[in-house]
A protein has these predicted regions:
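Conserved catalytic helix of short-chain dehydrogenase/reductases
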Residues: 1-17, 70
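A conserved structural motif in NAD(P)-dependent oxidoreductases
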Residues: 53-64, 75
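A glycine/serine/threonine-rich, flexible loop-to-helix segment
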Residues: 20, 30-53, 94-115
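Short-chain dehydrogenase/reductase
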Residues: 77-93
Length: 115
């Protein structure tokens, strides 16, 4: 399972309920992916964002797809009920940066002003 927090943030219950039918249930926790929303950013702003990631760059859609393919493969047939972060490591350090990121990133400021 995947597609966002609204779909299934916790795959454990479906894993328990569907496991007896041979169905696995997992969640991909995708991080930032380069999209056209990044187009207005300057190269310096892009680099500043990338510097926050332990992997040094945002994840690609191909990397997200590779994780999905793996979880759908025979090699992962006994992996169920997991949340797999594919986020360039930002999830492990997000709390440290979250306050400053929201306060200083123009996109985030506009997003939170709408809420």
């Amino acid at each position: 399972m995947g597609g966002g927090v609204a779909v299934c943030r916790n795959p454990r219950r479906p894993a328990v309920e569907l496991g007896c039918k041979g169905i696995t249930a997992n969640a991909i926790l995708a991080g930032a992916i380069r999209t056209d929303r990044w187009d207005p950013l300057t190269p310096e702003q892009v680099q500043e964002r990338r510097d926050r990631y332990p992997a040094g760059k945002e994840s690609s859609s191909e990397e997200i797809a590779a994780a999905v393919r793996f979880l759908c493969s025979d090699e992962a047939r006994t992996i169920t009920g997991v949340e797999l972060p594919v986020d360039s490591g930002i999830g492990v350090c997000l709390l440290k940066y979250n306050k400053d990121w929201i306060a200083n990133d123009p996109y985030n400021v506009k997003y939170w002003e709408r809420k």
